[in-house]
Amino acid sequence: MQKFQIKVPASSANIGPGFDVLGMSLEEYMTLDVEVSTESGPCVLTYEGDGKEHVSLDVQKNMITQTSLYVLRCNNISTFPYATKIHVINPIPLGRGMGSSGSAAIAGVMLANEIAKLGLSKLQMMDYVLMIERHPDNVMASMMGGFVGSFLRELSEEEKNAFSPSADDLLKNEALTLPPKSLGTFARLPWASELKAIVVIPEFHLATSKARSVLPTSYGRTDVVYNLQRLALLTTALGQTPINPHLVYEVMKDKVHQPYRASLIPGLQNILATLNPDTQPGLCGICLSGAGPTVLALATGNFDEIAHAMLSIFEKHGVKCRYLVLSPAFDGATVKYF
């Protein structure tokens, strides 16, 4: 019998003006404790953590094991080859903008890689992940670790056909081919050691599809230039020591998605308008985490005070929240054998 553990960090994407570009991993981990027998038998899945009452334990329906089966079928393996026990421990909030679905997809690909001894590198595994989760900013951060920028390359017409089925269709399809190679490219960006992330997590879910639906289909040049100018500076500003909080605060502003999503998150506009490095010493910048509703604040100190100021504003708008103070997970996703 083999025993191993897969750990996949949470992530925050759309950092500041970096919509669909910038992401960071966070030291809050989805963990899979796996036992693989040398004999054939069923795969048994158990789960504890956020959303337990809503998470399917059916291997054919759970996102982690569905993704594993997708990878196995791409490699001509129809099902889990050995009796497998998987216990998932997941503190990452579901549907809150902390990359829970991306972490699940990564965990599923890594699980298949270990069980079938496919020998895939992290970048090779990312090709499968990106077939399921097609926004690289959060999954690249979770897989590779740290603060990253990323993009999907342009595909040939043949590759577009392979990429065209939806993730749901891929997960249900029995006849599958290998994904296009080198789908995503990333670069690790500098990160000042004194910076930490305060994640304020509202007690309500916001589906990414709903958050996407409020965005415009096209943007004016002024708003695009506004974001591009700040994005260029942010990728350097977060790595400077000492941190310039007023610079970071300004270059974390956004006009591409936050103004449109603010109506879905009561209190967000007030937080963005009233909290700054002058009112909250130690605060460097604030933005939505992913599509929300979680709000991310970067700070060098006074973490609890900043968090409580944000919680107070949310409370005035009738929104209950909790918060975490987290560092980037620089190792990304890992596997450990026992």
UniProtKB/Swiss-Prot annotation:
A GO CC annotation given for this chain: cytoplasm
Summary of the function given for this chain in its UniProt record: Commits homoserine to the threonine biosynthesis pathway by catalyzing its O-phosphorylation.
GO MF terms held by the record: ATP binding; homoserine kinase activity
Organism of this sequence: Schizosaccharomyces pombe (strain 972 / ATCC 24843) (Fission yeast)
Name the UniProt record assigns to this protein: Homoserine kinase
Gene behind this protein: thr1
UniProt EC number: 2.7.1.39
InterPro entries in the record: GHMP_kinase_C_dom (IPR013750), GHMP_kinase_C_sf (IPR036554), GHMP_kinase_N_dom (IPR006204), GHMP_knse_ATP-bd_CS (IPR006203), Homoserine_kinase (IPR000870), Ribosomal_Su5_D2-typ_SF (IPR020568), Ribsml_uS5_D2-typ_fold_subgr (IPR014721)
Enzyme class, first EC level, given as a word: transferase
Taxonomic lineage: Eukaryota, Fungi, Dikarya, Ascomycota, Taphrinomycotina
Gene Ontology BP terms: methionine metabolic process; threonine biosynthetic process
